[in-house]
Amino acid sequence: EASKVALFDMAQYGWKQWRSAQEAEQINDTAFNYVVNGNFKDSEVSKAFRELGKHMRNQNRPPHVTKLEESVELAPKLTAFYNKLKSGQNLDVERKELKEIFAQLKADAILLKEKGDKKLIHQIHYWLDNTVDQMNALEALLTATEGLAEKNDAKVWDNYYAGLKHYDQSISYAFFY
């Protein structure tokens, strides 16, 4: 079911080549709408699916296939956070922003799992469960960095450990292709 987005994109491109990146993006958005809603209109669920899709692109692609970057909008924010963390700078603003982003991705995964097309969810629930666990891990790890700033060892270690447990859970799912 999830592959229908790519099939829709390819069919549209083959039938009438895109004239701009904006047109390609519009077609891609419409494909996500159709896969989730069975029609071409936006919905809360199709927007959630589209947002999750931006962060779940397969990076193990053969060399002859154009590489699609994963989490393009998020990567620079994570790099900036990491660099500030290494240099001991204040992370309050970046931490808050990342927590909001991760909370939204978690909410998107939960919404899609609860209200998405049943055939689609049956096939991708592993990715959705993985996403929820990964976002829980990231939330805990970000909270651990608060403990670093506060010089609160218990907060660091409790949240670091919680983050590792969530991460371990996230990699426990069997993905069937």
What are these regions (language model features)?
Residues E1-Y177:
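Substrate-binding groove of N-acetylhexosamine-processing glycoside hydrolases
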